[in-house]
């Protein structure tokens, strides 16, 4: 399948550069995955689309301030490091710029020596394995010296770090936020609980592969990046109860979707406690096994994320919805507006 089938025209001014002042004031497009019918709402209207017995699945990963600026100890040359994945102990898979200046044995100093890293291995596309040394607690030092790794399409400076975290972020380890969750406030989540909507939590640590463009000409040639996920026994039991009682499982974001579909694929359609690495790639033709609905942002043209949404809601429906979003001047990408996709997605007054 040609990746150009997932292209659409997006004016640059529709790429949201800063978050809205209030999380829940973003707009919400509601898309019926069967008919392609569209409704234009505000995010707080999600209360009218979720019902008693439904379950929202939220990714409680927390974004690391994963971008570090340091200098080579021997020359003083500036080096930028992006933490991608913790391997063992203090060894990390990273991206460095400029990569040609960092070879095996190179020592990089951050914060006037408060944190140091030695290159212990190299990989393609600027990848380097670094081993860190420090006194104290690594994540406290990272919190002091690191910057939030905003996506490349965001040019503005983020004034408040917390706006690139969900209000329920807990498990540190992501290089990017699970952005569909950024629309929820604690008050909105409380209102959903009062209505009888269950909340279930999983963890998937988002990698930078999320932003890597598909370089292959066809979908089938593309290889997905792997990301770590975890689902507890408590969450699995809750989701199975919801299913047994006829409720809907609504995932918040493509990361929650990937987690549930990975587990269901690996366990004959069943949801159970599990953890591991997933490189699941969902595009049209994929049969969903776990979810009934999806809350997600508006994604990049030709990205694996728009392919996932197209697998769930039909490519023609999704591209029509995206073109409608452009016409109606929705805000796109990480700090942009949201979409709720489900069957028979109609507002109810209850």
From Swiss-Prot:
Catalytic activity: 7-aminomethyl-7-carbaguanosine(34) in tRNA + S-adenosyl-L-methionine = epoxyqueuosine(34) in tRNA + adenine + L-methionine + 2 H(+)
Gene Ontology biological process terms from the UniProt entry: queuosine biosynthetic process; tRNA wobble guanine modification
Top-rank EC class of the record's enzyme: transferase
Keywords: Cytoplasm, Queuosine biosynthesis, S-adenosyl-L-methionine, Transferase
Primary localization class, coarse: cytoplasm
Keyword Coiled coil: no
EC number: 2.4.99.17
Gene Ontology CC: cytoplasm
Family (UniProt): Belongs to the QueA family.
HAMAP family: QueA
Subunit structure: Monomer.
Protein name: S-adenosylmethionine:tRNA ribosyltransferase-isomerase
Lineage: Bacteria, Bacillati, Bacillota, Bacilli, Bacillales
Gene name, Swiss-Prot/TrEMBL: queA
């Amino acid at each position: 399948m040609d990746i150009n089938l997932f292209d659409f025209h997006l004016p640059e001014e529709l790429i949201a550069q800063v978050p809205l002042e209030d999380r829940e004031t973003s707009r919400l497009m509601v898309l019926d995955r069967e008919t392609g019918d569209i409704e234009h709402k505000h995010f707080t209207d999600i209360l009218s689309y979720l019902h008693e017995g439904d379950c929202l699945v939220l990714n409680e990963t927390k974004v690391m301030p994963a971008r570090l600026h340091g200098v080579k100890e021997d020359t003083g040359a500036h080096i930028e490091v992006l933490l991608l994945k913790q391997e063992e102990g203090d060894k990390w898979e990273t991206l460095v710029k400029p990569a040609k200046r960092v070879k095996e044995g190179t020592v990089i100093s951050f914060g006037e020596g408060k944190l140091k890293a030695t290159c212990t291995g190299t990989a393609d596309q600027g990848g380097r394995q670094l081993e860190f040394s420090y006194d104290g607690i690594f994540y406290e030092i990272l919190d002091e010296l690191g910057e939030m790794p905003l996506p490349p399409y965001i040019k503005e400076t983020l004034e408040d770090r917390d706006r690139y975290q969900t209000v329920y972020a807990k498990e540190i380890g992501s290089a990017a936020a699970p952005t569909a969750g950024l629309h929820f406030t604690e008050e909105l989540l409380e209102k959903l609980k009062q209505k009888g909507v269950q909340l279930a939590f999983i963890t998937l640590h988002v990698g930078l592969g999320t932003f890597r463009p598909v370089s292959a000409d066809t979908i089938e040639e593309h290889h997905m990046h792997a990301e770590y996920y975890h689902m507890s026994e408590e969450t699995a039991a809750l989701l199975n109860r919801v299913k047994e009682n006829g409720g809907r499982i609504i995932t918040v974001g493509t990361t929650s979707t990937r987690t549930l579909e990975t587990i269901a694929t690996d366990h004959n359609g069943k949801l159970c406690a599990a953890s591991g690495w997933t490189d699941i790639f969902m595009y049209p033709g994929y049969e969903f096994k776990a979810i009934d609905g999806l809350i997600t942002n508006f994604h990049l043209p030709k990205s694996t994320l728009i392919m996932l949404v197209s697998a769930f809601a039909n490519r023609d429906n999704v591209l029509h919805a995206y073109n409608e979003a452009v016409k109606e001047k929705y805000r796109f990408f990480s700090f942009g507006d949201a979409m709720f996709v489900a069957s028979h997605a109609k507002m109810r007054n209850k």
